[in-house]
Structures are given as structure tokens and as C-alpha cells.
Amino acid sequence: VAECEVDDILAEVSGGEARWTPVAAGSTELAQIPQNWRPIASAATATERCRHALSLWGSDFMALLPRFTRRFQDELTDVRVFRRELGGLSEHVLIYVAGQARDGFPALWLGWDPAVLGQPEAEFFGCFPAAVQAFLRYVHPGFTAQDWQSYGIRRPDTWESLDGYDWFPRESFAAIRSEPSQLMWFTKDSGQLYYCVNSSLPSGRVTLAYEGSFDPPSDFAAELDELLRRRWDEQ
């Protein structure tokens, strides 16, 4: 893979005050990244990097999102390790390059290092299916597009309930027999469609929210599978 592709990635994720640095074979940074990421950073080819990265994903998580997984595997062209520095803090991120969206820009996903965030104990963690919980604990505690919010699952350290949000009138919560403190949005599309878990419901259910109203709860896996596949349809 040509080095210019690293520049393409940097063009997408750079901005603000954070500094992004690629970690590759021969880098003095190799000893600082997660041990199971070192084969990715050290690999000589993009094919090897992709293979090593996908080997970390659990089969249960892939089975939960079968259509996205197939498309992701087909589109995946490279995986790179980066160090992100801001305000004296440093963390490592895997960036997956999976083809292009309809707008012509790279379709990227950012996967965070579990060691940085530790074992998630967020309030809403138990709302997610077991396969997602395992993915968040052991693979990536946060897997999203480069906006850190959409087309995946936000980092657990950003989770908060809808209590205090002014997006939804009180009657919207009454319609689904829930309190704002029971809902948390964990991802969204490129617009204003939000995907929420609800602590009053069994795991495996998701509530979609748009323009101040909520849809009835639906199947978590089916809805997330469909959302992630729409990443390539962005304009």
C-alpha cells in the first residue's frame, strides 16, 4: 500500500489540536502499543495488516452483524496503527480503511485500545448483547467513523443518559413508557437518527430516535447491521 494512503487517512482524522502519528514496522513506538496490535504495525503488506486485525474480532460479534461483516471484509483495504496525542495524553487507535463512501472520501472506522479505557463499567453496559459487550471489553471500547459518534458504538467513557437533553419533549418519553435517565444514545447516522439502548428493556433491543420522537423498540442486531452497511452510502 502506497505511503500516500497514510496521508489520506491523516487528512480525514486530523484537525483541531490533536497530533496523529502512524506506528509502523521499525518504529520505536512498537513497544508502547498493545501486544496484539504489534503484528499489524509490523506487517509488510496491507493484506497482512487486515488479516491480523480481523483475527482479533470475535466470531460472535461478526455473526451478530453478518451483512456488515461481509461488506466490511470485502471492502477492507488496509488497517493502520496511529498514536493520538492531545494535551499531554497519548492513546493508540486502529484505523480501518474500508473502501469509499458515495461522497468519494475513504470509509474509515476508528477502533480504540482496550488498555487505555480499562474494563468498561458504564451504567448502560449491560444493555448490549453479550457479543457486543465482549467486543467492547477485548477488541475496541469504541468503534465508530472518524467523528467518534456515528456508524458504530461510541466509547463508553462518553456514554450518558438522555436526562437533561432538550431534544425530546416529555411526552415522547411517556409514549414509550420510559424516563430520560433510562435511555442512552450509543451511535447515529450522518444526520439526526439516533440509536438508543434502554435500561428498562432486555438486552438485544434498540430504540431509534428522530426529530423528537421515538420508534417502538426493535431488534438491536438487525438495526445496527443495517446502519453500519449504510456507511458506504454516505453522500
What residue spans do the PLM features occupy?
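A recognition module on extended beta-rich or small alphabeta surfaces enriched in W/G with H and D/E
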Residues: 178-180, 186-235
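A surface-exposed partner-binding patch
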Residues: 1-193, 200
